[in-house]
């Protein structure tokens, strides 16, 4: 099974590319979705988070109050490290389980949609690394327009991620998303053809 890591900075259009790959029948393991799944009621990570950060991070129905957790987890580097120590191993474990399940079911390709692929060193575990790339100023413009974020907030988020040149060095294939949505569809079609050529 061909394991593909798909990544890109915030506002790069990575999720759009993941959706286009999914619509072609490729299995997507979405790291953000896995992160949500591992803190569902009944999951060990949720109990550990409540123990570490206090029972008041739980809503009355027993689900995680994300804003409440964020308010406690991002006040210091130590608290953020504690959050990561609880969640990151579980995300890695569950993601690996989903990859193995896909392989057992005969999938030829599985795509790991992971914002922090390079930061976490997971690019080295992939057969193919795809980076969706957009100029920083264009990403800022799109995020301010489409998500209603402030420019300062966008720039802070971009600065918290690995620089684009580091991400690009890890890439086997770069999908350029500086153009229109139609251009991105054309880039995705080329990517799909490249993937299929490697598995057929």
Swiss-Prot record:
Catalytic activity reported: 3'-dephospho-CoA + ATP = ADP + CoA + H(+)
EC class (word): transferase
The keyword Kinase appears for this protein: yes
Domain of life: Bacteria
Main location: cytoplasm
An example Gene Ontology biological process: coenzyme A biosynthetic process
Residue span(s) of domain DPCK: 3-200
EC number: 2.7.1.24
Listed GO CC annotations: cytoplasm
A family per Pfam: CoaE
Entry GO MF terms: ATP binding; dephospho-CoA kinase activity
Residues annotated to bind ATP: 11-16
Pathway: Cofactor biosynthesis; coenzyme A biosynthesis; CoA from (R)-pantothenate: step 5/5
Subcellular location(s) per record: Cytoplasm
Keyword set, alphabetical order: ATP-binding, Coenzyme A biosynthesis, Cytoplasm, Kinase, Nucleotide-binding, Transferase
PANTHER family, A to Z: BIFUNCTIONAL COENZYME A SYNTHASE-RELATED, DEPHOSPHO-COA KINASE-RELATED
UniProt family annotation: Belongs to the CoaE family.
Role summary: Catalyzes the phosphorylation of the 3'-hydroxyl group of dephosphocoenzyme A to form coenzyme A.
Protein name: Dephospho-CoA kinase
Gene: coaE
